[in-house]
Amino acid sequence: MRGTLPRRGRPGRSPAAARRRALSLLAALAGLLAALVVALPQTSAVAAIPGESNGGVRIMPLGDSITDGYTPYPGGYRVTLWQDLAGAGHLVDFVGSQTNGPAELGDHDHEGHPGWRIDQLDANIVGWLNATDPRTILLHIGTNDINQDDDVADAPARLSTLIDHILRTKPDVQLFVARIITEQGEPHATMVNTYNAAIPDIVASKGPNVHLVDMHAALTADDLADGVHPKQEGYDKMAAVWDSALESVPASLQPLPATPAPASAN
């Protein structure tokens, strides 16, 4: 009876060699997949969005979730405002470190930060301004100072400081400061009124490039979806107010005049 001989591996097929061969095949496969991904056309989720950074007048929408465009209408007032400005023939470039909104919004950039207070904007504003160099700023802020009960009595002073930092960094900017929209229920509705009452004097003290926008008068509690954030119709009302304010200050929709170069000495 013949004994069973032990099986022998094929020459050159040691375990170490097999591992090297497997790794080589995996590397080749990974390279092929990478090439295929690069060759595929971009999907709508990652493709460049027409109108972004289009060389127009740089406008920074600045604020909290109302600027971001909290549900039920992502993009908020920025959607209709962009459409209105573009429809009137203005070439504008919304700027900011944030980006979101629906396809009908031609430029998704902004500085709307959900849940943020005045002091949080103030802590970041210089970096944002230096990064984006806006010609015009639309500022709606203070709602979260009230909702978070963050030393509300001092909120106007914090707003004044924020404005000072904006003007110190960009002295030629056109800054539009809103009296913020109402809220449903007490005591917040009254707190909004108290905060808003201080804003006109603050704006008047900041010079000719700072403009008061009475957003509070444009919306009622019926325009709110959840007691704080507007419905789509409410955001459309906000867009109309911003649009009217911008149109009333032609410089806000025009590039900053170029500074003439100094004459060279002969």
State the predicted function of each range.
Residues 65-69, 76, 98-104, 142-148, ...:
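Solvent-exposed loop/turn segments at secondary-structure junctions
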Residues 48-78, 247, 251, 257:
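N-terminal module-boundary/linker segments of secreted carbohydrate-active enzymes
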Residues 125, 159-164, 196, 200:
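Generic structural signal for well-ordered alpha-helices
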Residues 2-48:
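Secretory targeting and sorting signals
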Residues 58-60, 66-157, 190-194:
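Conserved SGNH/GDSL esterase-like catalytic core that processes O-acyl groups on lipids
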Residues 55-59, 88-93, 132-138, 170-176, ...:
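Loop/turn elements at helix/coil->beta-strand transitions in domains of secreted/extracellular proteins
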